[in-house]
Every structure is written in structure tokens, then in C-alpha cells.
């Protein structure tokens, strides 16, 4: 019998049930479809719905949609499809609530991409792959990407929002500068006699991309660190289109959306692929995934045509906000149903992407490598903040930490060690 003023502790199981019940009410309905026309057989997709964040409860679910466009063979694309999700989830502590889990995703995605690349390269296979990896948790959409496959969003309010980056050297000046600063050479294919043809490529290797998973023979300045964007849709929902470059080299985002308006996802994906192939023919594998995020009470139908008046509002909402401009934007667009940008970062520097300045500073476990999740023994871990003149000493307040192997990879990706050093050491 309790005394007056005594505080009762609510069991964790009860709290989880309450949270799960709320999530079930809040979660939208997801309807998806995909289509492919193959040329080389190097495009692969991953679709997993109702993955469980809390194992066994059947309610705290999220969905995953991945597109892997391989090159120089399919090994990297297949390996990434089979291992990336597990590597991302391994980087997220198991005791987080829903909001913390979502906040942890951006850094976990970075860790998962780097671990997948590191593990695949240890197999000494030279193929590579682009990755566009989408996680939908409730109304929050998190996208991580390397390469030139893309993901776009058409919110129900209207407009087009690009959720991925294009890492082709031809169009990305910032990436060209990074590659050359790290020791790579950027130029077109030289056919002899001073004649150069084709898109800009990275040499050695001749890859057109600055970021990918795999590509052991190109150099470590071609990094697996993804561009990550995270947005929260309004309760009106929206449509995602995830496609390989076989689509985007032929049609624009607006053309992709217009050619499938009024159609369900499966038919939409087929129409988009046919539209792209009809314009340029089958020059490459052409793959498309369409995902509709819908309110539960709405019928299963495609996203309605965008409202023209919504475009200006959405573009303003997605711009980076300074402390001076944020209040003005909030006053001008104080409407409840708008898309909210939660996170965006595209730096290729692993030390910046794992820095504790980002939300949820305690997401990394002490004495565990932040990338590969192996145990780091006292005295062996390297703080992500450590400079070249700092001693390798474990201190809890200096985390997160990297094991020696992941620190070595970080140094190579950031141009602190040439990729040739690794190849020579592996051949000894």
C-alpha cells in the first residue's frame, strides 16, 4: 500500500506500449511500385516494409527503399544491397525512443556506408556502385546517397524537392576540387593527339563519380561518405521517385512527375521508365521506384497535382536559415501543413560527419568504433577529434572513437595518406 506523496514508477513495458499505440495512429500508409528495363544487369533494388525498430512489437515500424546502380560488375551492388541496412542499424543504440532514433539516423547512415565500403574492399573486388538509400519512419523521410542515382519528393502541397546529391564530376565543382586536393586527377578521356572526349573522370581508373561504394582500383579520394537529407512531411503526405541515371539522363524531375500523374505507384514506375527509354533508348539499366506516403484515412491513390502557389513556400522553407532570416520565414509561412527540413549535410570529411556537434551527442557507445562497431581496447582507440600531434588516449569526453583500421581509412579519404600506400602495404 502506497503512502501519500509516494512516486510510482511506470514500467518500461507500459511506456513502450503507449508509444507504440501513438505511433500506430500517427503512421501513414505506404504504397510502392517499381519497374526496370535492363541493359547490363547491374541495377539492384531493396524494398523492405514494416521493419521493426523495437523487435517483436509489430508496431514501431519503418520502411526501406534502396537503389544500387553498379559499374564494372555487379558485385558491389549486390554486396551493398545485402549488408548496408544491417550496418546502419548496428550503429544505432537499441534503447532509443522514436525521436532519438530518427535523430540518430544521419550519423548512423554515414557509419553504415563507410563500414559497407570498408568490408567490401577487403574482398579485393574492383566493382563499385552508386547508392540511394531511403528510410521512411512515420512522416520522416531520410535519404543517404552516393553517386548519380537520385531521389525526388513531390509533397502534396506542391513543388519538387531534391533529396539526394549528384556526385558526377562533370557537374559538381566542389567535388572536383576535393578530389584534386586529395591527390586525384580530373580530366576527360584522351584519345591521343590532344583530343579529349566524354565526361570528366577521375584518374587513375576513369570513374565519372566522386563518391561510391567499392571501386578499390580508383583511389580512396573516391569516398563512400553519403550526402544525407532528412525531411518531415505534413500529414497530407507526398510522392517519392527514386531512379537510376538511366531515367535522369533522359527526363527531368518535372517530366517524371507529369508523365505518371494520376497513376498508382506500380504503373507510375513503369510509365517513368518507358518515358525515359522512349527518349534515349536503352543505353543503360533504367530503374525506378515510386513510393506514395498517404494519410491512413485517404484512399490508395496517387498524389494529387501540385498546387502552383505552394512552390514558392516550399523553396523558401528548404533554404538554409540564418538566425536573422528564420524568424521572418516563420512569420511569413506560419502554416501547419508544410514540409520541414530536419537535417542536411554533404561534407565528405568523416571527422565532420561523426562529430558530436550533431544531435544526440551520446548516440555512440564508449569504447566501440563508431564505424565498424568493434570493441576498442583502452589505449587503442582514436578520438574522431584527435589531431596528428595528439596522443592516442581514450577519454570518454573525446569520443566518438575509431579503431585503428577505420582511422587509417579516414586519413586516406581525407587526403592525409595516399591510396597507393594502402595498395603497397596489402601486396607486401
From Swiss-Prot:
GO molecular function list: metal ion binding; protein serine/threonine phosphatase activity
Chemical reaction(s) catalysed: O-phospho-L-seryl-[protein] + H2O = L-seryl-[protein] + phosphate; O-phospho-L-threonyl-[protein] + H2O = L-threonyl-[protein] + phosphate
Region Disordered, residue ranges: 301-331
Xref: InterPro entries: PP2C, PPM-type-like_dom_sf, PPM-type_phosphatase-like_dom
Gene3D superfamilies: PPM-type phosphatase domain (3.60.40.10)
Cofactor details (free text): Binds 2 magnesium or manganese ions per subunit.
Positions bound to Mn(2+) 2: 69, 245, 284
PROSITE patterns: PPM_2 (PS51746)
Binding-site residues, Mn(2+) 1: 69-70
Any single Pfam family the record assigns to this protein: PP2C
Protein name listed in UniProt: Probable protein phosphatase 2C 12
Amino acid at each position: 500500500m502506497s503512502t501519500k506523496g509516494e512516486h510510482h514508477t511506470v514500467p518500461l513495458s507500459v511506456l513502450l506500449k503507449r508509444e507504440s499505440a501513438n505511433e500506430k495512429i500517427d503512421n501513414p500508409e505506404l504504397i510502392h511500385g517499381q519497374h526496370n528495363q535492363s541493359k547490363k544487369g547491374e541495377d539492384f533494388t531493396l524494398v523492405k516494409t514494416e521493419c521493426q525498430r523495437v523487435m517483436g512489437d509489430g508496431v514501431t515500424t519503418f520502411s526501406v527503399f534502396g537503389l544500387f546502380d553498379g559499374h564494372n560488375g555487379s558485385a558491389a551492388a549486390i554486396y551493398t544491397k545485402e549488408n548496408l541496412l544491417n550496418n546502419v542499424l548496428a550503429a544505432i543504440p537499441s534503447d532509443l525512443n522514436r525521436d532519438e532514433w530518427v535523430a540518430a539516423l544521419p550519423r548512423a547512415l554515414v557509419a553504415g556506408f563507410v563500414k559497407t565500403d570498408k568490408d567490401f574492399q577487403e574482398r579485393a573486388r574492383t566493382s563499385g556502385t552508386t547508392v540511394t538509400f531511403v528510410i521512411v519512419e512515420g512522416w520522416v523521410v531520410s535519404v543517404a546517397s552516393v553517386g548519380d542515382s537520385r531521389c525526388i519528393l513531390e509533397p502534396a502541397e506542391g513543388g519538387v524537392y531534391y533529396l539526394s546529391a549528384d556526385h558526377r564530376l562533370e557537374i559538381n565543382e566542389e567535388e572536383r576540387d576535393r578530389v584534386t586536393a586529395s591527390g586525384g586527377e580530373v580530366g576527360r578521356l584522351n584519345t591521343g593527339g590532344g583530343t579529349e572526349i566524354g565526361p570528366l573522370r577521375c584518374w587513375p581508373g576513369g570513374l565519372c563519380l566522386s563518391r561510391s561504394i567499392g571501386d578499390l582500383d580508383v583511389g580512396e579520394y573516391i569516398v563512400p561518405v553519403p550526402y544525407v537529407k532528412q525531411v518531415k512531411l505534413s500529414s497530407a503526405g507526398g510522392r517519392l521517385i527514386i531512379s537510376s541515371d538511366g531515367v535522369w539522363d533522359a527526363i527531368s524531375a518535372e517530366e517524371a512527375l507529369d508523365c505518371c500523374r494520376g497513376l498508382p505507384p506500380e504503373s507510375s514506375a513503369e510509365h517513368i521508365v518507358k518515358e525515359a527509354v522512349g527518349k534515349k533508348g536503352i543505353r543503360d539499366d533504367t530503374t525506378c521506384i515510386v513510393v506514395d506516403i498517404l494519410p491512413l484515412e485517404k484512399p490508395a491513390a496517387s498524389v494529387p497535382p501540385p498546387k502552383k502557389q505552394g512552390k514558392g513556400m516550399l523553396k523558401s522553407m528548404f533554404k538554409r536559415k540564418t538566425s536573422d532570416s528564420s524568424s521572418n520565414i516563420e512569420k511569413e509561412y506560419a502554416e501547419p501543413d508544410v514540409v520541414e527540413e530536419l537535417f542536411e549535410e554533404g561534407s565528405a570529411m568523416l571527422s565532420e560527419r561523426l562529430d558530436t556537434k550533431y544531435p544526440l551527442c551520446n548516440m555512440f557507445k564508449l569504447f566501440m568504433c563508431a564505424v565498424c562497431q568493434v570493441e576498442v581496447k583502452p589505449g587503442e582507440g582514436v578520438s574522431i577529434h584527435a589531431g596528428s600531434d595528439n596522443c592516442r588516449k581514450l577519454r570518454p569526453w573525446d569520443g566518438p572513437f575509431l579503431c585503428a583500421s577505420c582511422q587509417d581509412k579516414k586519413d586516406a579519404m581525407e587526403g592525409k595518406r595516399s591510396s597507393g600506400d594502402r595498395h603497397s602495404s596489402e601486396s607486401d
